[in-house]
Amino acid sequence: MKKGICCAGNMIVDITYPIETWPKQNELTHITEGITRSTGGSVCNTISDLARLDPQLPLVASGFAGHDAEGDFVLQEMGKYKNIDLSMVRRSGDTSFTAVMSNNQTKERTFFQYAGGNAYYGEDDIDWDKLDVDIFHIGYILLLPHLDEPDAEYGTKMA
């Protein structure tokens, strides 16, 4: 019997804005047609891919989704997969989001990130007694500042 995988950490909404060109400081550029909204971050990206690869694989999501429309969107998207357990997702504060500027000419992207609840996610937010999985995956460390704090024994809390 499969025990499954827990995907923990960032739950992010990515809003992608196609732009004509990257402007210099104090200059203007136009946002063109094709603005998109999608889920992102380690939890959403990893768990949805795993759910599609094996619909029978038990999966557990752990992280923060805000008490806002973006948090509702994150839960709705992950909720499309019957094998994703959302019981360890906490609703708190604002949902993390990234405004992605996608240059139509060069295809390069620039990311503006708002941490939201992800800034406070830490080991105390994981119900270790309830969690019964074979694999625990967590990320993205640089977007989880509470877990990136120094630790005398291991270097950082996440280590």
Language-model features and meaning:
Residues 1-64, 69-79, 144:
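Glycine-rich phosphate/adenosyl-contacting loop at the front of the ribokinase-like
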Residues 1-13, 72-90, 102-159:
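Ribokinase/PfkB-type carbohydrate-kinase core domain
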Residues 30-31, 61, 97, 106, ...:
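Generic hydrophobic-segment detector
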Residues 62-67, 84-95:
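Beta-strand->loop->alpha-helix junctions that form or flank phosphate-binding loops
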